[in-house]
Amino acid sequence: LEFRRVLFRSQLSVTDSIEGALSGTEIAVIAVPSVTMRDNASLISSYLSENSAIVCATKGIEISSGKRMTEVIREEVRAVPPSRIGALSGPNLAPEIASGKVSTATVAFEDESVGVSVQELFSSEVFRVYRSEDVTGVELGGALKNIIAIGAGFIDGADLGNNAKAAYITRGLHEITRLGVAMGARPDTFAGLSGMGDLIATCISPLSRNYRLGVGLASGKDLELVLGELGQTAEGVPTTQAAVQIAKGLDIDMPITSATYQVLLEGMEPVQAIRELMVRSL
């Protein structure tokens, strides 16, 4: 396991009891795979109240509905007001945070007072938290960047060079922003930590599971084998499926996302997908 040697601080305790973890809590953090979010949110609903707040740290989109994670939580945890359900996102490679390296993030809540409380709670000398009220933008930046990270892995795995990768990341950000704005986000959010910041970190680091997935596919391995080797959730796979359907419904052109979908689910070779992106109509 990636964090088996990480020591918890003495103030922390571990439990497998939902009631024990959440009973009387003011701020709950939920960080589970997106495909299990609805079930997990339903499980915790009876332990929270109108005075609770929920911080969602999952970066994904529900495939079946196309809904963001906070939307799913709001549907399942009715006791907590929607304005008190928000998201934490940013360039947060978990192993670096666990080892105490300097990191930053953005927390987004519609209720400003809750956002301030969460910001103050999470901030430390090595973890600086900024605040936003654009929950949609913060969530979508964190979710959609995983799609782009898979393609960044294609480029590095095929040794296509830094020029290609820089151009790809730039166009990827443009694509994320285009879909995000169509879904109700503010465009400037994607220039921040939960957009550009998260995108850069995830596209350049071997600590990124989605990046490693792309590298593995570019080496000729099939999807199931690479996912098995990762041994962890790669949110870019279900998010790609969801994003393709959302973009189709909104009539938004998403060439990078579509190319990634073709590799993941239709068997296209990664290098061929990159080539086809290069010869699209100008």
Where do the model's predicted regions map?
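Rossmann-like NAD(P)(H) cofactor-binding subdomain of soluble oxidoreductases
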Residues: T15-S23, I27-V102, V118
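Internal alpha-helical scaffold of NAD(P)-dependent oxidoreductase catalytic cores
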Residues: T36, Y47, V72, E76-R84, ...
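NAD(P)-dependent Rossmann-like dehydrogenase/reductase catalytic/cofactor-binding core
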Residues: A152-D156, V181-A191, G195-L282
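Alpha-helix C-terminal capping/helix-to-coil transition sites in glycosyltransferase folds
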Residues: E2, S23-G24, E50, L144, ...
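Short, small-residue-biased leader/transition segments that mark boundaries at the very start
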Residues: L1-L7
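Structural alpha-helical scaffold elements that stabilize or flank donor/cofactor-binding regions
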Residues: V6, G20-A21, L193
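Short, conserved active-site loop motifs that form the nucleotide-linked donor/cofactor pocket
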Residues: Q11-S13, S52, F127
